[in-house]
Amino acid sequence: MNDPISDMLTRIRNSQMRGKSTVETPASKARARVLDVLADEGYIRGYEAKTGKDGHPAFEISLKYYEGTPVIRELKRVSKPGRRVYMSVGDIPQVRQGLGVSIVSTSKGVMSDANARSQNVGGEVLCTIF
């Protein structure tokens, strides 16, 4: 697997389209940081570390729905292994006029676009969520 973040986002997107309540993904520090931002912004209920079916560490992600429809309507990977996207603090895009969130990997850690602006740091734009 070349892009673990993209794999996790695809698992979340596919599970929500199928109406699943939870989804399992292999564990890593980078995935945990992205999941922390998703939980803080209210796009997932939370996640917990456990041992996967194959015996390796995994995260069980609890997906969030509002009146039967998924809270996450759109989930896009921006920076990819073949084309990294770095932006200064002034260039970080607002998703849907501020209704969505960009997840940015900065020198101060992985955070939402609003936190990056408030701390005046830019970085690699990992994905956008609406």
Swiss-Prot record:
GO BP term, pick one: translation
A Gene Ontology molecular function term of the record: rRNA binding
Keyword rRNA-binding: yes
Entry keywords, A to Z: Ribonucleoprotein, Ribosomal protein, RNA-binding, rRNA-binding
Signal sequence extent: none
Protein's UniProt keywords contain RNA-binding: yes
Superkingdom assignment: Bacteria
One Pfam short name: Ribosomal_S8
GO cellular component, one term: ribosome
SUPFAM superfamilies: Ribosomal protein S8 (SSF56047)
HAMAP family attached to this UniProt entry: Ribosomal_uS8_B
Described function: One of the primary rRNA binding proteins, it binds directly to 16S rRNA central domain where it helps coordinate assembly of the platform of the 30S subunit.
UniProt record similarity statement: Belongs to the universal ribosomal protein uS8 family.
Assembly behavior: Part of the 30S ribosomal subunit. Contacts proteins S5 and S12.
Name the record gives this protein: Small ribosomal subunit protein uS8
Organismal lineage: Bacteria, Pseudomonadati, Pseudomonadota, Alphaproteobacteria, Rhodobacterales
